[in-house]
């Protein structure tokens, strides 16, 4: 830990109210003031931390996390508190300068986000919701985005997004579920219009349930509907003539339909796909036609036509023609 200067002053009574003043210089230039009733039940407190600047490197391979002009207010007691946080944060390679404005209430095993506002790169995000970890983990969160640039957080997907996403879920040692009932996003990706709308549900019982999910990216349209699990019935409708820009180092065309039925571990697959100029990282495929069906149980059988030209994966696999 880098050297820091610390100045602490205490006054008052340990049996009634203890007033404190703490000043630090070095890693964190900050002042903490307030009072605490140490002898009372739940320890009532009223604290304020003002930090002009501070930074700390959590790992040698990452840029340090930096904060500036942070004001934190904490009132209530250890079992029922109210927190307000305002300030700036940046660093760790992928966090642009972001203004944070938090208003929250909490108890020993839960926290309620009355409002969390983030502003960065000319965009904003507003989150409200709650989380509880008394018995496993539970959450209920809604995010509203307005021209939010996610490229610093997901470098492979340089998108600017507006709209709403909501999620509820829970997890413990035996069960888990994640419900995303609302996905309604619009914006741009790699200078092309983008929209993603629908809902998704995942759980330990049914791995994936998609009532409907539609991605539009430029002239590309990818729709998914159905379930994956012990009784899979998932339909994919892909009309993607130009995938370039959807993800880093992805290019090519995929058009057609696919269906997955039955047990996920031994599925029946029906497919009719045409692929052209596909490239992703170390994989290249000039052209392919995949049509037919494959049944996995009780034994693998079916009728599948595969025609491909110039398939290459890295330097280890090269095939000129597959028929």
Residue ranges and their predicted role:
Residues 54-58, 92, 148-152, 185-186, ...:
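Sequence/structural signature of outer-membrane beta-barrel proteins
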Residues 1:
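Glycine-rich phosphate-binding "P-loop"
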Residues 4-15, 20-24, 30-43, 47, ...:
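Extended lipid/amphipathic-ligand handling interfaces
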Residues 20, 45-47, 83, 139-141, ...:
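Transmembrane beta-strands of outer-membrane beta-barrel proteins
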């Amino acid at each position: 830990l880098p050297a820091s200067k610390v100045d602490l002053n205490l006054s008052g009574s340990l049996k009634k109210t203890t007033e404190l003043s703490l000043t630090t210089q070095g890693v964190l230039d900050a002042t903490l003031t307030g009072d605490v009733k140490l002898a009372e039940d739940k320890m009532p407190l009223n604290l304020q931390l003002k930090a002009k600047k501070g930074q700390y490197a959590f790992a040698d391979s990452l840029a340090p996390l930096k904060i500036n002009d942070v004001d934190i207010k904490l009132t209530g007691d250890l079992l029922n508190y109210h927190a307000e946080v305002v300030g700036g944060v940046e660093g760790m390679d992928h966090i642009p300068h972001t203004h944070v404005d938090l208003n929250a209430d909490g108890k020993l095993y839960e926290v309620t986000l009355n409002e969390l506002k983030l502003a960065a790169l000319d965009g904003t995000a507003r989150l409200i919701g709650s989380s509880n970890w008394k018995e496993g983990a539970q959450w209920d969160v809604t995010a509203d985005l307005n021209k939010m640039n996610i490229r610093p957080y997901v470098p492979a997907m340089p998108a600017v997004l507006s709209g709403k996403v909501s999620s509820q879920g829970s997890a413990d040692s035996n069960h888990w579920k994640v419900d995303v009932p609302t996905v309604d996003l619009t914006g741009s990706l790699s200078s092309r219009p983008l929209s993603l709308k629908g809902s998704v549900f995942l759980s330990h019982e049914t791995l994936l349930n998609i009532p409907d999910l539609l991605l539009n990216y430029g002239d590309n349209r990818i729709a998914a509907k159905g379930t994956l699990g012990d009784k899979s019935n998932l339909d994919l409708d892909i009309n993607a003539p130009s995938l370039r820009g959807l993800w880093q180092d992805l290019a090519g065309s995929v058009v057609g339909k696919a269906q997955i039925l039955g047990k996920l571990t031994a599925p029946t697959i029906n497919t009719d796909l045409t692929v052209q100029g596909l490239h992703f990282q170390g994989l290249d495929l000039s052209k392919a036609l995949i049509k037919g069906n494959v049944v996995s149980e009780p034994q693998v059988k079916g009728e599948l036509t595969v025609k491909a030209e110039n398939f290459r994966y890295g330097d280890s696999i090269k095939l000129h023609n597959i028929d």
